[in-house]
Structure formats: structure tokens, C-alpha cells
Swiss-Prot record:
Gene: trmD
Keyword ATP-binding: no
Protein name per Swiss-Prot or TrEMBL: tRNA (guanine-N(1)-)-methyltransferase
A family per Pfam: tRNA_m1G_MT
HAMAP family: TrmD
Biological-process GO terms, alphabetical: tRNA N1-guanine methylation
Location relative to the cell: Cytoplasm
Residues that, per the record, bind S-adenosyl-L-methionine: G112, I132, G133, D134, F135, I136, L137
Length: 234
């Protein structure tokens, strides 16, 4: 699988893949990375890529010409690119999207800055437009990294134990069950906090049943919207 990032600040993104799980996956050649800076495709001597909006409005907009050139250059490599634009007006990214997109050959994340990207670029290239929530960020780099991380976790071999993926939050519209580590009794300020005793008895069927019950209770409390969806699909 291949990921390409189109960004005015590629150096902000490269470091994310230098440690931990994703670094090991990259060393195993489970995915490849490319970074493209639209400034390298600007035709003016100052490598300018932004200008004021036609019709007025606050802030600057990333221009169509350099964005077209960089995305067209990616298309011409014929690596089956799937263009994803990051925009607050896009649909909200979720775990189902992460699973679906993990089957793509080559995902290109197009990261805007300033007040966004000339709309005509999206009309020409966008396969999908995503947001990670109803809030505004300085640029599309962080959402792109968030999405890339979530997608890669669904690529076979990236996680050491694929069973952990099946147990994670949002599978079957349930949050992941509460998890506990040693010690069995955690004591602070004369208060004792216990791990559920069923977890220590070794009966895997009963442990699995308890985890499902706890996951259901947790979802009902923290995400009633998900819980209703889970109940509806039973």
C-alpha cells in the first residue's frame, strides 16, 4: 500500500512515521510514503501558491494552478491514486471508512492551508472529502495523519496481533471493554480499586461474556448514540 501527502509543510509529517508501530511496518515494506510540496510546482519565481479570494472574504486561498500541477503529476505516474481532500465541510471519518480505505492501493491526502483550496481543484480530482470533526484546524496535515494511522491499523501485518483490532472500540458499534493490568488490587489514599474477579478465573467464555456486558454498559454511558445503533442492529 502507498500513501502520498500533498502539503506545504511535509517536514511536519515525516517524523510521525519514524517511531513505534508504523516505523516497524514501514521497515517491513508494508507501506510506502511520498511527500509532495505544491510550492515545487508553482510557476512564479517566489514559489507562491496562495492569493486573495475572488469576490472578497477574509484570508488567502491555495490557488488552482500549482495544486492542479502537483496532483496531475501524481496521476501521470499511473499508480491508481485515490485522492482524499481534508476539509471541515467533508463527511466525518470513522472506523468503517478506515477499514474500507485500507483496501486501496494508493491514497493521496491533499492537505489545505490558509482558507482552504480553490474549489475547482476538488471538482477535478476529489474522490472523497473528509473531516475529523466539527472544528477548525490550521491545516489538513493533522487530519491526514489521523486518518493514515487509522487506515494502516487495518492493513494486514501492521499490528503484531490482529485479534487486538477485532476487540477495539467501534467494532459492532460498541466501545472497547474496560481493560486492566497488574496489580489486581490498586490502592491509593486508603482506597482499594479492584480488577473484576472473573478476569482471574481463566474461564474464557465467561470472560468474553463479561467483556461484552462491560462494553455495552460503557457505550451506553459514554456514547448513547452508538449504543442505540448497536441495539437497532441486534
Amino acid at each position: 500500500m502507498k500513501f502520498s501527502f500533498v502539503s506545504l509543510f511535509p517536514n511536519l509529517m515525516e517524523f510521525y512515521f519514524q517511531d513505534s508501530i508504523l516505523a516497524r511496518a514501514k521497515e517491513k515494506k508494508l507501506f510506502k510514503l511520498n511527500f509532495y510540496n505544491p510550492r515545487d510546482f508553482s510557476k512564479n519565481s517566489y514559489h507562491k501558491v496562495d492569493d486573495y479570494k475572488i469576490g472578497g472574504g477574509a484570508g488567502l486561498l491555495m490557488q488552482a494552478e500549482p495544486m492542479y500541477e502537483v496532483l496531475r503529476s501524481i496521476q501521470e505516474k499511473k499508480e491508481n491514486p485515490y485522492f482524499i481532500f481534508l476539509n471541515p465541510s467533508g463527511k466525518t471519518f470513522n472506523q468503517k471508512d478506515a477499514k474500507r480505505l485500507s483496501k486501496k492501493e494508493h491514497i493521496v491526502f491533499v492537505c489545505g492551508r490558509y482558507e482552504g483550496i480553490d474549489e475547482r481543484v476538488l471538482e477535478i480530482f476529489a474522490n472523497e472529502v473528509f473531516s475529523i470533526g466539527d472544528f477548525i484546524l490550521t491545516g489538513g496535515e493533522l487530519p491526514a495523519l489521523v486518518m493514515c494511522d487509522a487506515i494502516l491499523r487495518n492493513v494486514n501485518g501492521v499490528l503484531g496481533n490482529m485479534e487486538s483490532l477485532e476487540e477495539e472500540s467501534f467494532e459492532n458499534n460498541l466501545l472497547e471493554a474496560p481493560a486492566f493490568s497488574k496489580p489486581f488490587i490498586f490502592e491509593k489514599k486508603n482506597k482499594k480499586f479492584y480488577t473484576p474477579s472473573e478476569f482471574l478465573k481463566g474461564n474464557h467464555a465467561r470472560i468474553a461474556s463479561l467483556k461484552t456486558t462491560l462494553a455495552s454498559c460503557k457505550t451506553k454511558f459514554f456514547r448513547p448514540d452508538l449504543f442505540l445503533e448497536h441495539e437497532r442492529k441486534k
